[in-house]
Amino acid sequence: MGLKRVVVIGLGLSGKSIARFLARKGVYVLGVDSSIQALQHCPYIHEKLLETDEFPTQVDYVVRSPGISKDHPWVKAARAAQISVVTDIQLAFQTKEFIEQKSFGITGTVGKTTTILFLEYLLRKAGIPAFAMGNVGVPILDGMQNSGVRLVEMSSFQLADQETSYPVLSGGMILNISDNHLDYHGSFLEYCQSKQNLSLCMRNPEDLWVGDQRFCGRSYWEEVQKYMRLLDKESALKPLYLHDKYNYCCAYLLAQAEFPIAKSLFIEAVATFKKPSHRMEYLGEKCGVHYINDSKATTVRATEKALLSIGSRAIVILGGRNKGYSFVSLLPSLRRFAKSVVAMGECAQEIAQDLDGFPVTVVRNLHEALLCAEEQAIPGDVVLLSPACASFDQFRSYEERGAIFKQLVGMEEVLL
């Protein structure tokens, strides 16, 4: 790289992978975090700095971890000093692993992880080595060490700083778009622009598939609907949620653009694929009441899709930390598919105000929410955890929130 002094801001999972990658390249790494513990537990940094320290001199460039805001004081200081700020995605896309090998990228508001994991599963069933990485849980700078087709899930955080073209992706897809992370991006327009930045990563911009006319690229709707009709004809398949069919068909379309995969193999993959947890995860039935864990639903749009998929009268558990939007748009779906709402956590009162006129009970936490939902439920009802909010008011992650819900329901023993 030729650059010797690099600042890495944020030393979580991705930040550690960035520091490790740079250190192995012989770079002098200056690690920055708000936590002394995080600094102490990262052996790849040469200089430990707290966020309250002064911005150092003689820095070649700055790498911000995906969760670090572009308005972070150190990011602002770097830009004021005309020092380049990049993400792990931009570092990875300059390496020979991406320049010389086939890779795909997926972004969108909802469905990214399911789509990319199904794409990985489908390609492997077809005998094609493939590895999912990025926002899916394996940092891209770690995952790219695997040989084979690289499948990169990219968040708006990772794409927000994309100003330079890194044309390495053979295929790409923007699945969908709806309000999300407005607390981070500041506006819906800026959020959309971060997603559109995926086009800067394409070898050929015409190979970017999009599902919304607000984006530049090839519309995938006609092809995806054709594949969805194919699945509808397969009576041997277990019933699928509408959004799952959509995600699987998007993955198949992306795969088909590069590899000839038989429809029969696609159908077999759909039948045997195990979806990741906390995404419309059916937990079972107790006393005639059905329980679904959709803790991953951290946006209003995701909860709307959950309600549409159920298509029956549900008692919906909402709440957590608001990501910067109103809950009013949920009302049409709630009136159609829900009996009532139990609102919990930091923005429970805000939910009750936005859903004025619809039955809402306000509680403090998830335990109380489940007890309240069970008091209201009768045989045939669905208790749906689909919070439409981030989890950070009371939990470390949506995974922890979902795991505790499963434990409270009594469907799974969980050790946390």
Curated annotation (Swiss-Prot):
Nucleotide-binding listed as a keyword: yes
GO BP: cell division; cell wall organization; peptidoglycan biosynthetic process; regulation of cell shape
Localization in the cell: Cytoplasm
EC number: 6.3.2.9
UniProt keyword terms in alphabetical order: ATP-binding, Cell cycle, Cell division, Cell shape, Cell wall biogenesis/degradation, Cytoplasm, Ligase, Nucleotide-binding, Peptidoglycan synthesis
GO cellular component: cytoplasm
Residues bound to ATP: G108, T109, V110, G111, K112, T113, T114
Database matches in Pfam families: Mur_ligase_C, Mur_ligase_M, MurD-like_N
GO molecular function: ATP binding; UDP-N-acetylmuramoylalanine-D-glutamate ligase activity
Role description: Cell wall formation. Catalyzes the addition of glutamate to the nucleotide precursor UDP-N-acetylmuramoyl-L-alanine (UMA).
Family of this protein: Belongs to the MurCDEF family.
Identification of the protein by name: UDP-N-acetylmuramoylalanine--D-glutamate ligase
Gene source species: Chlamydia muridarum (strain MoPn / Nigg)
